[in-house]
């Protein structure tokens, strides 16, 4: 697994080299400018419209650059709200949410610098200055992630190659959509009493039906 991860470094180098100048000399691998990214290793949780305070996304990332992540200064997280119900009328522009500095990175079981990131539903709404009345199920929060290197270089969604972002092998976390879900509030046993009935020799009768809703 470590050999596979180390091979990622050769791949990300290509994304930091300009492709707009045909006169650039061919560089040896050790002398090339390296890029950097955070690889999403796992993600759990959801944003439940009916349980805002307890809803969150928990994400584990590993950091990669030409020096095993040691040249990364910080990992910034921004967020915006994307309204899908009212034609964008409720959308809220991107705002800063959190910065994870290199001093907060930890070394995981595989020996890589990493972070456990908690994105709370309530904390996200507070960042954007909105309440439950301002959001709808089916809309989503879009998170933007940016890496800043110790030498000042910046890597984000806009200057990172699409293969690095979309490939499951690399899973570079530079953008994430978190949809708001509305689970059914009718889960459990439901008893339905009918108003319909009929006459018999014993009088007028009604009936009820019990069912289970998932």
Describe the predicted segments one by one.
Residues 3-10:
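Sec-dependent signal peptide recognition
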Residues 4, 20-144, 148-193, 197:
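Acidic/polar, low-complexity intrinsically disordered N-terminal segments immediately downstream
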Residues 192-214:
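Short, solvent-exposed loop/hinge segments that bridge or flank secondary-structure elements
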Residues 10-11, 44:
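Intrinsically disordered, low-complexity segments enriched in polar/charged small residues
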Residues 15-18:
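C-terminal motif of bacterial Sec signal peptides marking the signal peptidase cleavage site
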């Amino acid at each position: 697994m470590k050999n596979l991860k180390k091979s990622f470094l050769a791949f990300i180098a290509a994304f930091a080299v300009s492709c707009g100048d045909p006169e650039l000399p061919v560089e040896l691998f050790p002398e090339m400018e390296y890029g950097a990214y955070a690889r999403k290793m796992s993600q759990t949780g959801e944003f439940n419209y009916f349980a805002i305070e307890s809803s969150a996304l928990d994400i584990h990332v590993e950091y990669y650059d030409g020096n095993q992540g040691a040249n990364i200064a910080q990992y910034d997280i921004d967020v915006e709200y994307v309204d899908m119900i009212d034609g964008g009328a409720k959308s809220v522009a991107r705002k800063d949410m959190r910065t994870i500095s290199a001093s907060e990175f930890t070394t995981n079981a595989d020996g890589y610098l990493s972070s456990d990131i908690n994105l709370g539903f309530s904390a996200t709404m507070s960042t954007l200055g909105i309440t439950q009345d301002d959001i709808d199920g089916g809309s989503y929060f879009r998170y933007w992630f940016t890496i800043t290197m110790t030498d000042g270089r910046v890597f984000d969604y806009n200057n990172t190659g699409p293969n690095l972002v979309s490939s499951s092998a690399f899973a570079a976390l530079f953008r994430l959509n978190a949809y708001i879900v509305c689970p059914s509030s009718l889960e459990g046993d439901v008893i339905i009493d009918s108003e319909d009935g009929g006459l018999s020799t014993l009088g007028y009768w009604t009936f009820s039906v019990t069912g289970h809703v998932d």
